[in-house]
A protein has these predicted regions:
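Cysteine-centered catalytic environments shared across enzyme families
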Residues: 1-173
C-alpha cells in the first residue's frame, strides 16, 4: 500500500506543509517518499508519494515517476502488467524498470484514459502532463484503492486518505 496526494490550482503550497503531509503518509509507504512540483502560468501542481516497494524494489522505480512530460503518483497493483508489457514491446517502447508504474504511465501516454480498459487490478493514481497542464485521476472500478478529493477555494486537492487533504489544504472538515 502506497500513499498518494496532491494539489492543482493557483495556491502555492508551503514546503513545510508538503513535508508534514509526506510524514503523515509514511504509514502507507515507509520505503521512500518524495514530491513533484511544477508551475504552469498561474497554476501550481504538486504530486506527493509515499512508497511501499512490492514489484520492483529498485530505487529507479521511486515515485513520483516521470516519462517525458508526464508524471505519475500511483498506489496499487496492476495484476496483468506483464501481459501489458508485451503491448509496449510491440510498439518498440524500451522500459527502464520492472515496475507496473512505468507500464501504466506508458499505456496512458499511448492510449489516454482508454488505458483503463486494459487494466486488471486495484489502483488509484494521478498523472500530470506538464506540457498541457492537465491532471488525470482514476481509481479501480470497485474502489479497493481509495481516492478522496475536494475542491476548496479554487484548489483541487486529492489523497489516498482524507487526512492528506486536510494537511495540504489546512482546512478542518
Amino acid at each position: 500500500m502506497c500513499g498518494i496526494a496532491g494539489s492543482f490550482g493557483t495556491k502555492l503550497v508551503k514546503k513545510s506543509d508538503i513535508i508534514q503531509t509526506l510524514d503523515l503518509m509514511k504509514n502507507r509507504g515507509p520505503d521512500f517518499s518524495d514530491y513533484y512540483e511544477n508551475k504552469f502560468k498561474s497554476n501550481q501542481v504538486y504530486l506527493l508519494h509515499s512508497r511501499l516497494s512490492i514489484i520492483d524494489l529498485n530505487k529507479r522505480s521511486n515515485q513520483p515517476f516521470k516519462i517525458n512530460n508526464y508524471v505519475i503518483s500511483f498506489n496499487g497493483e496492476i495484476y496483468n502488467y506483464k501481459e501489458l508489457k508485451k503491448i509496449l514491446f510491440d510498439k518498440k517502447i524500451k522500459l527502464k524498470t520492472n515496475s507496473d508504474t512505468e507500464v501504466l504511465l506508458w499505456l496512458f501516454i499511448i492510449y489516454g484514459e482508454k488505458c483503463l480498459d486494459l487494466l486488471e487490478g486495484m489502483w488509484s493514481f494521478a498523472i500530470y502532463n506538464n506540457k498541457s497542464n492537465e491532471l488525470f485521476l482514476a481509481r479501480d472500478r470497485f474502489g479497493e484503492k481509495p481516492l478522496y478529493y475536494s475542491y476548496i477555494d479554487r484548489e483541487f486537492i486529492f489523497g489516498s486518505e482524507v487526512k492528506f487533504i486536510k494537511s495540504l489544504s489546512k482546512k478542518n472538515y
